[in-house]
Amino acid sequence: MPTLNQLVRKPRKRPVAKSKVPALDANPQKRGVCTRVYTTTPKKPNSALRKVARVRLTNGFEVSSYIPGEGHNLQEHSVVLIRGGRVKDLPGVRYHIVRGTLDTAGVKNRKQSRSKYGAKRPK
């Protein structure tokens, strides 16, 4: 426990919280252009082909972002909107692409959780 005099000389240091999504620089979403669309395999106990896109953002960052839902229409030069949110079994993927905005189509035949996948209400 420091004395009052020691605290006057050198005050306590506040811990600095490190951002989990640095490329968004405090914005909820960011726009970017796909530079590469590919599939990756997840970490050890899981097995699949996860759809991922490399995106160059408007602020110059280049990040890997996950394409959620079944099927997508993305290719190189597609303009996408990304949000934060990591994929636990894909190391280095810390962002999600927002479905149903800009060049990203919503998921076809989606009945539940439609707002998360940019799907319109079925007739």
From Swiss-Prot:
Function: With S4 and S5 plays an important role in translational accuracy.
Biased composition (Basic residues): 108-123
InterPro entries: NA-bd_OB-fold (IPR012340), Ribosomal_uS12 (IPR006032), Ribosomal_uS12_bac (IPR005679)
GO BP, one annotated term: translation
Positions of region (Disordered): 1-26, 104-123
Positions where 3-methylthioaspartic acid occurs in the chain: D89
SUPFAM superfamilies, alphabetized: Nucleic acid-binding proteins (SSF50249)
Oligomeric form and interacting partners: Part of the 30S ribosomal subunit. Contacts proteins S8 and S17. May interact with IF1 in the 30S initiation complex.
Gene that produces this protein: rpsL
Entry protein name: Small ribosomal subunit protein uS12
GO molecular function term, any single one: structural constituent of ribosome
GO cellular component entries: small ribosomal subunit
UniProt KW keywords: Methylation, Ribonucleoprotein, Ribosomal protein, RNA-binding, rRNA-binding, tRNA-binding
Family named by the database record: Belongs to the universal ribosomal protein uS12 family.
